[in-house]
């Protein structure tokens, strides 16, 4: 496994790799912000057979953090991350410095569809998906430029992000196949997240309540004669608040566009999504049903 810092170095490393540079040979790519856990590594292992050279990026993207969020304190665990990536079969780690990826102010930014990107996470974190789309487009350009395309793996844990990236790829006719990876969970059901490390011991025990709330909401929505979704969502919010959380949203949406479902929406087409703060830690999760 090799590590590169700049876009020219990355493109040269991909071209020089034995699995690339031949007709029909394409990269597989997993973008990360580092501080890797088993969920990230599952995505890397999933990507391994999907390309001829496997690239993972480590970059904490300032553009997707609000001023009051944890950009400066976000854990940087470089040596441990590289060891995990190498063990998972990664060929190239692209770890640009901010000056490498943004050598000048990024005045051109992608503005995603507000119907998809200004709801849910985008409502509570304004500008988040502009930052995500801008950096992902730049990473796609860096990784897939020479090959003319390839495969990128994104986790369902960040469900709305996955939908936004898929829409971006479709809208710009990018030669990238976006593959979804299932959410990795701890034994008690908590979705693995880099921010779980912010939880105290007591909060970590309590944190499973978010996934339990989503499961209960999904079950209630499918019950015969269920009340209107708005009433079920309000009840779920109240229950989580009574348990000591500060919830942003708990809601049921259509999977394909994250809009409220039509009456009688078929099972297998919906997703329950939630975001809530426990102490100082904001967690998100989702459950397809």
Swiss-Prot record:
Residues bound to beta-alanine: 64
Location relative to the cell: Cytoplasm
Binding residues for ATP: 33-40, 155-158, 184, 192-195
Catalysed reaction equations from the record: (R)-pantoate + beta-alanine + ATP = (R)-pantothenate + AMP + diphosphate + H(+)
One CC-aspect GO term: cytosol
GO molecular function: ATP binding; pantoate-beta-alanine ligase activity
Active site feature: 40 (proton donor)
Protein's GO biological process: pantothenate biosynthetic process
Binding site for (R)-pantoate: 64, 161
Ranges in a coiled coil: none
EC number: 6.3.2.1
Signal sequence residues: none
Domain of life, source organism: Bacteria
Pathway stated in the Swiss-Prot or TrEMBL entry: Cofactor biosynthesis; (R)-pantothenate biosynthesis; (R)-pantothenate from (R)-pantoate and beta-alanine: step 1/1
Entry annotated with the keyword Signal: no
Cited SUPFAM superfamilies: Nucleotidylyl transferase
Entry-linked InterPro entries: Pantoate_ligase, Pantoate_ligase_C, Rossmann-like_a/b/a_fold
HAMAP family to which the protein is assigned, alphabetical: PanC
PANTHER family given in the database record: CYTIDYLATE KINASE/PANTOATE-BETA-ALANINE LIGASE, PANTOATE--BETA-ALANINE LIGASE
Note: The reaction proceeds by a bi uni uni bi ping pong mechanism.
Protein family membership: Belongs to the pantothenate synthetase family.
Subunit structure: Homodimer.
Protein's UniProt name: Pantothenate synthetase
Organism of derivation: Acidovorax sp. (strain JS42)
